[in-house]
């Protein structure tokens, strides 16, 4: 496999593209959720989950092993006081920012050129919010932009595990050497690369609209 790091992708032989969501299509900022939870009394939010690590409780939620109600109860226990459900949801969703229109336009355009897929480590509460937000702002649901979408909380697996990449490949009869995976987190690449998938690290300050898709 080839790791593609240049600003302009070499797309020769690439026929399928797998996109990450947060930090690639949807702008996110973990700091905003950290600050929101600090106001609620949880002062070490980033010790539990960030772009680069996750604790067992949050991993269970992002792999569908906890219900929304169980997640909210767990947050109340972490904070140590009975916060309102709406407060927790608002703080949890604070990290979700915007979908730049140019990215949505790109995804619509390249569907005629590549088979495109979404592969996201996410959860039920976030999914409800960003799905509604995209429809409100752009008149389209996230699922309509791809041939198929894979959310960690529905398939009960998450990146960087090899199984979730195997699922996407086998589920859609994809050849790894014809497939490109775009993500903003380097830790998500090793297992994909072992399977022969090409990868592109979307570095801070770069945008999918600028990399030659």
What are these regions (language model features)?
Residues 18, 119, 181-182:
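Generic enzyme active-site microenvironment
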């Amino acid at each position: 496999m080839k790791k593609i790091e240049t600003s302009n992708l070499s797309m020769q032989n690439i026929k399928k593209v797998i996109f990450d969501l947060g930090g690639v299509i949807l702008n996110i900022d973990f700091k905003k959720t950290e600050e929101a939870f600090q106001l609620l009394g949880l002062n070490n939010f980033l010790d539990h989950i960030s772009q680069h690590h996750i604790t067992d409780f949050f991993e269970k939620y992002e792999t569908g092993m906890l219900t929304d109600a169980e997640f909210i109860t767990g947050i109340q226990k972490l904070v140590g006081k009975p916060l309102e459900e709406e407060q927790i949801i608002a703080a949890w969703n604070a990290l979700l920012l915007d979908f730049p229109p140019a990215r949505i336009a790109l995804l619509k355009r390249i569907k005629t050129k590549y088979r495109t897929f979404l592969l996201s480590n996410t959860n039920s509460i976030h999914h409800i919010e960003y799905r509604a937000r995209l429809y409100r702002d752009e008149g389209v649901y996230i699922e309509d932009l791809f041939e198929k979408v894979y959310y960690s909380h529905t398939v009960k697996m998450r990146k960087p595990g090899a199984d979730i990449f195997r699922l996407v490949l086998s589920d859609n009869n994809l050849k790894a050497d014809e497939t490109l995976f775009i993500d903003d987190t380097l830790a998500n690449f090793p297992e994909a690369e072992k399977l022969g998938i090409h990868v592109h690290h979307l570095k801070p300050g770069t945008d999918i609209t600028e990399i030659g898709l």
